[in-house]
Regions:
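Acidic, Mg2+-coordinating catalytic module of metal-dependent nucleases/exonucleases
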Residues: 179-223, 229, 426, 430-495
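Catalytic cores of nuclease domains that cleave nucleic-acid phosphodiester backbones
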Residues: 45-134, 291-324
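Charged, glycine-rich intrinsically disordered N-terminal tails and low-complexity linkers that flank
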Residues: 1-65
Length: 501
């Protein structure tokens, strides 16, 4: 993978942000094979498009001059800065790395700053420029502060003054001042560390995390690398902090962990008895490729394995970024037979309340039916919808007491030979497949955004298909849990030590 014929390195704000999140990304971007890198997902593309639209809106609302090096009057960033234009949009500055130690084999290093804007602070006679980041988010994030600090650092090389504040414009369009001194102090170290990583002879050792890696284009490569080099890292419950504890105890494989005793692991600093039980059981399940039962399921988290006259499986599609629940899907089951799928869709976000009321009415037609869902999102979203649309607390309580979270049932009742306790991973282990193989929560949000933009009904059909399959996957899991016959439960003292995965 590595190419020793290195070209000069150009460091941008996205490079620094990627390095701050994961040291392996800049290394792979420089040395990795393009065949191992995935194209950005449609959801990532949508986020970029939303940011561009927001930037355009801000530029209209707060006029300035946009950088255009091809303009006959010379609209380069330095030229516009010399003119002290009040607002400069889409700025582009490039400077050599100023006096920082970098590896000798790195070659020339350039810093390329492309802030969304620069704003002149001061009078016509004296002052300085400060950087601007325009983001479509609702709240300030550390990444935005780091990007502003990088732009301020580069500005300091251009105008002989390093601004210690920057402007951040979020979804509401308000211009917020952000203090940058803390991040500015870290920029030189981050740049030096990035240089050391990209010139290293070996790829950085990192620990995958679902929340951090889910949108990374190198995710599949890193997962395959871990599977080949150290499968123990992919075992649920083996975290960044627990992995070195296990290795120091001489446990370097799933098989060794499966054979370890709880008494052996419990005294280890950083583990304890609960984590020890969890890890050993997960290793036993994965090593044997069989479920390991923790306790009987009946009554667990409200779960009743016996078929009910009517059962409902429920799944919500929502865009938390824009605060809209656009599809509430309900699968209706009578006496163990799927009867119907109800797609309660909001083609217009303004119809959300209508969809919510339709769901309440539908669920109240079957007041004794349990409502199966997977994970806490449905409960949390129903609470938000009830508050948003003025649902009586008693009515909401009657609804939520019928909810049965199958994620809780699984993680408290059985250990499975899988890498992740997501609905897709569990259902696929059970042999269930989604009709749209690339579908997912992020793809759902993208489809809804595309529907709003194009009014192409195909996007709504894809949404409904994906949501229905989520409901059917939930029911498939419920069936399996009801049909499976756990052996004798663990002893009472061991049951008390189990913690969810």
């Amino acid at each position: 993978m590595r190419d020793d014929a290195l070209s000069p390195l150009t460091i941008t704000a996205p490079d620094l942000l990627a390095f701050h999140r994961c040291q392996r990304i800049p290394y792979l971007n420089r040395h990795g094979s393009a065949d191992d890198k995935q194209d950005p997902s449609a959801y990532v593309g949508q986020l970029r498009q939303e940011r561009q639209h927001h930037q355009q809106h801000i530029q209209v609302q707060f006029p300035g001059i946009e950088v255009d090096p091809t303009h006959p009057e010379g609209r380069s960033t330095p030229a516009l800065m010399q003119q002290r234009i009040h607002r400069i949009y889409k700025a582009h500055l490039e400077v050599p790395l100023p006096g920082l130690e970098t590896p000798s084999n790195l070659g020339d290093v350039q810093l390329r700053s492309q802030p969304d804007g620069l704003v002149w602070q001061g009078s016509d006679l004296e002052g300085h420029y400060t950087p601007v980041e325009i983001r479509a988010s609702k709240r300030i994030k550390p990444d935005y502060e780091l990007a502003l600090a990088f732009h301020a650092f580069v500005l300091g090389q251009v105008q002989s003054f390093t601004p210690t504040t920057g402007w951040l414009v979020l979804q509401d369009g308000a211009w917020q001042t952000v203090r940058l001194r803390r991040w500015l102090n870290r920029i030189p170290t981050l740049i030096q560390s990035l240089g050391a990583v990209v010139t290293a002879t070996e790829m950085p050792d990192v620990f995958m995390a679902r929340s951090r890696c889910s949108l990374c284009p190198w995710q599949d490569f890193c997962r395959e690398h871990s599977a080949q080099s150290d499968p123990l890292r992919l075992l649920p419950g083996v975290t960044r902090t627990r992995h070195p504890i296990l290795v120091s105890a001489g446990i370097t494989s799933i098989g060794e962990l499966a054979q370890a005793s709880v008494d052996q692991l419990s005294p280890l600093a950083g583990l304890g008895p609960k984590a020890a039980v969890q890890l050993v059981r997960q290793a036993q399940s994965t090593h044997s490729q069989k479920p390991v039962w923790i306790r009987p399921l009946e009554g667990l988290e409200g779960f009743d394995p016996w078929p009910q006259p009517v059962e409902l499986c429920f799944d919500i599609e929502a865009d938390p970024h824009h605060g809209v629940a656009y599809l509430l899907g309900v699968l209706l089951i009578r006496k163990g037979q799927v009867i119907d799928y109800h797609r309660l869709m909001a083609p217009d976000p303004a119809q959300e309340q209508q969809v919510w009321e339709s769901f309440l009415t539908l669920s109240e037609q079957y007041p004794q039916a349990p409502i199966y869902h997977f994970h806490a999102f449905e409960v949390q979203t129903c609470r938000k919808l009830a508050l948003k649309h003025g649902t009586a607390p008693r009515r909401l309580h009657r609804l939520l007491k019928r909810f049965v979270d199958l994620h809780q049932v699984v993680t408290h009742g059985v250990v499975l030979p899988i890498e992740s306790y997501s609905l897709k991973t569990i259902a696929r282990w059970l042999g269930f497949e989604w009709r749209l193989s690339e579908s997912g929560g992020a793809q759902s949000i993208f489809w809804y955004a595309q529907w709003l933009e194009t009014q192409d009904p195909h996007f709504l059909e894809w949404l409904a298909t994906y949501n229905e399959d989520d409901c059917r996957a939930t029911y498939r899991l419920k069936q399996w849990l009801a049909e499976a016959t756990p052996p004798l439960a663990l002893s009472a003292d061991l049951r008390d030590l189990i913690e969810p995965i």
